[in-house]
């Protein structure tokens, strides 16, 4: 500190001397050189990180330098910076290039910055001189020219650390000052080093303290976690102990109940023995009747006893006889239903029958029905493998409790019956290994040897029973001694029971292990079966493909009725095998756990045995259907339910061959005499709000037709009776090559049937969506055909009102057919009914003031636009009201790529004013035909259907089974009263 004070005093003295000699060079202050890192030293621009005081000084100097860029003073500081154009960018570049950052340290006396070391400062000075030499051409020469001082001062610039420090006006600065500066800088560097070292030590100490704190916190957290884990373990142990205690209490309660039961049985049997021994006759020791009766007495069953005794006493009935009779009736009905179900499933889907368990449930119902009938008849029941023994069964017949009064009579028939009791009890125990308590309850008059005999097998029971007979044939006096022995042996019986329970538990564990092994074996077998079945399934597919190819090659003019159905049934049953085996492999665990005793020993799939059976059973219903056709709504049962789309399609070749077969198409059919039973239903072609369309075949001629099936209840609920009647009326009147033909109509209790022409090419809508749009040529041909169809209808005073791509079908030749005449109507003047599709409806229909034939020409313009563009012009993602608003405005925007002639026709058809719309003018329909859009059209060739614009795509049809008895039918019927429903049916649908 003393040295620092001395240095400060020396510096102050030097400053005072310098101020006296050269007051104009106040910027070149030795004190400021040591105090600030950001100041300019002797014209150099070396900058370092400084404190707030040094930064303020550097800013002042920097501002003064900016203000004095153009002054020609004697000051060397300004001359150095004014030799070049010193703009802000050069400064920033220079500062960033020269800056030398060092770690911060504490200030010494608030004046000396600790960032400037001797070596570092020299590096900065060298950089500054180099940069000054590069940027300023020969700075030293300029300094010498501008100053009036000695040349020795310039030489000091190259040797001194401070650079051009002697460029000022004073001549009193010598080499001693430079040495003093070096000494002061060396002292400063020492202090900087010591301060930095102290700071580093302080930082290290702080880091160590923080690490220690973190370690302590981690240790505390670990200890808390360990304590929490220990508490949780203790809680778990307590819960386990509580559970064990509860189990022990339950076991004790069960043992007490068993002991109470044994005591009651012993008391009852003791009373019986006393009463029997008083009136004992040794003539009835080995009679089977008495043995059977004593079994019934000992077990609480009174089968084949005196009816007077049962009638006089009102015994507590376990199950009432009325309930039993009602259950019997229900089981008999259910068993019949299950029998029908099993027979049908055997013929149609045998694998579903095998895996569903329906057959097993049928057997269970039969067992239940037999038990109920036997209990009602009062017959004794024999235990079966699926039933527990009698001592645990709750008897279903009228039973009475055992009291002493029940045995006051029939004394002569109850003498020494212990032998028969032992025989029957041993047999019952062999039937069910889980129930061994009955052995001890019935051995009351036996010795200790007889108690041990109950634990043996059935082979030892006969020998033990013979010994019992010999003991019982001695005299009546031995009975009293045997009774006393029974009391002493009761504790032994309890011990034996406990041992037996332990043995039972061990046996159960062994059984479970065996069952698990069986499950694993079954899984392995099932995987093998599934692999075999996949191979067989592929073979069947190959065979079916070969069969279809052979059929297509060798097929003559006639097609058999059953070939397609047989192929489909074979594929269908194979597909059932494949899918169901996969389901079994995925669900083995659940099925095996639920069906341990009944289903473990059964194999789920035997392809070699059942392969030909399910094929024949699937074909059989089709032959039966052909010989004796079912009601029309039940014909869906003859078509197997399909799961795979690829394997359940009616081939396109079958459709094409049927259509092109001249013999089939040329056969005469009297449609007036046809019935519903003459037609066989196939695939679902389409569906609507209250109608479904299915492919059908006329059985005698094998010709394909289209059957439109309409639900009467839905029609009435939607109030479409008039439209349905109009559709029939219009179709019966029309006969045009561009309109679908209606051959006949049928009716039953629920449905209306329209027999129509089958159009195999599909809808025009599918072609537009598949290609995006249609070409100009195709659009011209189809628009011309539609014009001819509408011309025919308008000449018949019929308006169509539902022109859209969905109602335009493509026949096998590639021409248009109009279908779905639900909104068609025969009119003589304008009508005001509101109907149509929102995107195609005319504005005059929306107004409700009346519309006529011109509404169809509006729809024609919309249709031509959609065929060329791909979408209708008036479309909105919102509600229908938005579409209606666009239609009323009729601001149609045709894309520029559309042909100009087509654009002109669309703009003339889509006009809100009916009087200005093309087709409604004086020329009528001729104005449309004469439009340049149809300039290249030969209307006679179009009428004769000579040229088709495209080839139709006849695709295979998927099987979609229609359930005629659907829920919507019942829901629609609930909205209408039955009387009103029948009255409206008779009013509108009587002519069908």
From Swiss-Prot:
Segments of this protein annotated with the region Disordered? 1-160, 233-296, 382-503, 520-556, 581-602
Q: In this protein, which residues make up the domain named Protein kinase?
A: 679-934
Q: Which InterPro entries match?
A: AGC-kinase_C, Kinase-like_dom_sf, Prot_kinase_dom, Ser/Thr_kinase_AS
Q: Which UniProt keywords apply?
A: ATP-binding, Kinase, Nucleotide-binding, Phosphoprotein, Serine/threonine-protein kinase, Transferase
EC numbers? 2.7.11.1
Which residue windows does the record flag with biased composition (Low complexity)? Answer: 1-19, 31-56, 63-89, 104-114, 131-160, 405-503, 581-601
The protein here is known as Protein kinase 4
Q: Which organism is it from?
A: Dictyostelium discoideum
- The gene coding this protein: pkgD
